[in-house]
Amino acid sequence: MAALSCLLDSVRRDIKKVDRELRQLRCIDEISSRCLCDLYMHPYCCCDLHPYPYCLCYSKRSRSCGLCDLYYPCCLCDYKLYCLRPSLRSLERLRRTTNRILASSCCSSNILGSVNVCGFEPDQVKVRVKDGKVCVSAERENRYDCLGSKKYSYMNICKEFSLPPCVDEKDVTYSYGLGSCVKIESPCYPCTSPCNPCNPCSPCSPCGPCGPCGPCGPCGPCGPCDPCNPCYPCGSRFSCRKMIL
């Protein structure tokens, strides 16, 4: 158990680090491939006009960045993005694996299910319980400027599963936990039949007092000895024989 706790702590720290890196990479991915330092404030820039963290124009420039040729000698608009895309995919795989480990190692017996909502904020997640089913949905709108025009992109997920027969819809609760997982819980562990309450134990009866010992009865008189057989006198070693003539 101690080794498992240490492993989970290290995994949680890795998840926080991964979250920070994913947020940075998504910001890069949502921006246009061209550096718009002259028109707009680029989200990742270090030039004199827009100090850090609003540009990376002093780094190497990608050939597809056209506007940076007019004002700045180099840029990292595309270079950093394409170099880090393999890392982004590996981090996503690590997140999914970690979420499965955390879900399987949870010791709470009242968890009905968990849904991974990575990439969504808690206020963007909705949970609806109706007709014996739980529906977890999340939707996010991405908006960014590109060459004077605004572009929009949408991202949504929807997961649904049925409740066990013994769980009431009013008792279902949910929480947004570690690893961007929404946990659906109920106050009673789901079972096929409702649990019967335990009968109270009956109190122990008091022990009865020990009865007094009865007096010993008088010894009976010894019976009289039987008379000796005349054929076998007492103390004789040989029996008398009757001679027949």
Curated annotation (Swiss-Prot):
Residues in Sequence repeats: 34-38, 74-78
Residues annotated with Phosphoserine modification: 5, 10, 64, 87, 108-109, 137, 153, 175, 180
Tissue-wise expression: Testis. Specifically located to the round spermatid layer and to the luminally-oriented cytoplasm of elongated spermatids.
Superkingdom of the source species: Eukaryota
One GO cellular component term noted in the UniProt record for this chain: manchette
Major localization class: other
Pfam family, one: HSP20
Record flagged with keyword Phosphoprotein: yes
Location of this chain's protein in the cell: Cell projection, Cilium, Flagellum; Cytoplasm, Cytoskeleton; Cytoplasm, Cytoskeleton, Microtubule organizing center, Centrosome
Protein's GO biological process: cell differentiation; spermatogenesis
Classification via InterPro entries: A-crystallin/Hsp20_dom, HSP20-like_chaperone, ODF1_ACD, ODFP
GO molecular function: protein domain specific binding
Chain segments carrying region C-X-P repeat region: 195-233
Stretches the record annotates as 2 X 5 AA repeats of [RC]-C-L-C-D: 34-78
Cited function: Component of the outer dense fibers (ODF) of spermatozoa. ODF are filamentous structures located on the outside of the axoneme in the midpiece and principal piece of the mammalian sperm tail and may help to maintain the passive elastic structures and elastic recoil of the sperm tail.
Subunit description: Interacts (via leucine zipper motif) with TCP11. Interacts with SPAG4. Interacts with KLC3. Interacts with CCDC42.
Protein name per Swiss-Prot or TrEMBL: Outer dense fiber protein 1
Organism encoding this protein: Rattus norvegicus (Rat)
